[in-house]
């Protein structure tokens, strides 16, 4: 499949169709997220780092977490390490014996953000078909994986 039709429009390349729709959704959702984060007093990077820690069960070896954080946020190892260290110094994470974990203050902040996003977006999510959401998430994950594989080896060597 190299072309697609959207809402009766002429056929356009699949990448262009996906890029336009994802770009529009990202712009709108990023602005809404920024509002919630501002109300919570958090940065986007802090929020994303706390979300990534959730994937690790709220604790991980520091080096493994920094590598994972760098990969997911597309940061070099130095920047990912600086981000992790700043979260420790802010009291949102704790570091002990090379294990980094979410601190109670971080858990409270993440929950406040989660509630804010949930309250704001609930009317939108309620209108979506769960099967469509599942397909969209699966497709975007696959696109992300395939696109990451296109990066030069040197770019991926963090």
What are these regions (language model features)?
Residues 1-10, 60, 64, 134, ...:
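C-terminal regulatory/oligomerization modules of transcriptional regulators
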Residues 8-15, 98-103, 156-158:
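Membrane-interacting alpha-helical segments
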Residues 57-58, 91-92, 144:
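Short alpha-helix boundary/capping elements
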Residues 1-44:
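N-terminal leader segment of winged-helix/HTH proteins
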Residues 85-138:
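Charged, amphipathic alpha-helical coiled-coil/dimerization segments
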Residues 17, 48-52, 108:
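Pre-recognition alpha-helix immediately N-terminal to the DNA-recognition helix
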Residues 32-79, 84:
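N-terminal helix-turn-helix DNA-binding core of bacterial DNA-binding proteins
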């Amino acid at each position: 499949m190299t072309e697609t039709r959207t809402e009766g429009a002429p056929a356009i390349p699949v990448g262009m169709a996906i890029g336009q729709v994802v770009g529009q959704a990202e712009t709108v959702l990023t602005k809404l997220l920024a509002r919630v984060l501002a109300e919570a007093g958090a940065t986007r990077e802090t929020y994303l780092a706390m979300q990534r820690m959730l994937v690790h069960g709220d604790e991980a070896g520091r080096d493994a977490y920094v590598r994972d954080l760098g990969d997911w946020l597309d940061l070099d190892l130095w920047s990912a390490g600086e981000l992790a260290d700043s979260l420790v110094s802010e009291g949102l994470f704790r570091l002990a014996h090379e294990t980094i974990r979410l601190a109670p203050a971080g858990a409270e902040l993440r929950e406040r953000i989660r509630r804010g996003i949930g309250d704001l977006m609930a009317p939108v999510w309620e209108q979506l078909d769960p099967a469509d959401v599942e397909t969209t998430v699966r497709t975007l994950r696959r696109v992300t994986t395939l696109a990451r594989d296109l990066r030069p080896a040197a770019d991926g060597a963090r």
